[in-house]
């Protein structure tokens, strides 16, 4: 069985549910009282994709402006970036272009990026339509998912989807696999690996 170690960055504005998304995927847990991420936090989980074992090293980055200079260092060497927004907050969606530019500038050229519209359990508070999210993703040529970290809706689909995309790029020869370690997969030009929120009835 082939085994790949992939580095995944979860990024985007603050309070859109990045930490909750990661907690659900790695621990199958959800909490209405999540501590605000300070800098960068890290978890791992292994999954099986098309008879290949994928070990995901997932970095949860703080969305606050004061941590941006720290968190952007962790984009280097990443194979996957999940760019998250809150479907109930228009401002989080409007800020996406800046975050997208940051990911593309600080990451390798062929990094797999997915746009994640979180909190889709809050249907009565939705202000960003599915069509808007899909259009944004299409214009930027990236993947698109809507999730609920609270209800676990489509959480697995996100990580399965981005992992399958990476594997397809490896098979196409776009990514060169030298060995099994995270820094062994080169996406375009070689890069070096750089070493409480308010309560809500919706997911955080």
From Swiss-Prot:
Alphabetized GO MF terms: GTP binding; GTPase activity
Alphabetized SMART domains for the sequence: RAB, RAN, RAS, RHO
Sequence motif: Effector region, positions: 34-42
Entry membrane topology: Lipid-anchor
Transmembrane annotation, as ranges: none
GO CC, alphabetical: Golgi apparatus; Golgi membrane; lipid droplet; plasma membrane
Subcellular location(s) of the protein: Cell membrane
GO biological process, one term: vesicle-mediated transport
SUPFAM superfamilies cross-referenced by the UniProt entry: P-loop containing nucleoside triphosphate hydrolases
Entry-linked CDD domains: Rab
Lipid-carrying residues in chain (S-geranylgeranyl cysteine): 202-203
Keywords: Cell membrane, GTP-binding, Lipoprotein, Membrane, Nucleotide-binding, Prenylation
Coiled coil (residue ranges): none
Protein's UniProt keywords contain Membrane: yes
Chain sites annotated for binding GTP: 12-19, 60-64, 118-121
Family stated for the protein in its record: Belongs to the small GTPase superfamily. Rab family.
Protein name: Ras-related protein RabQ
Source species of the chain: Dictyostelium discoideum (Social amoeba)
Lineage, top ranks: Eukaryota, Amoebozoa, Evosea, Eumycetozoa, Dictyostelia
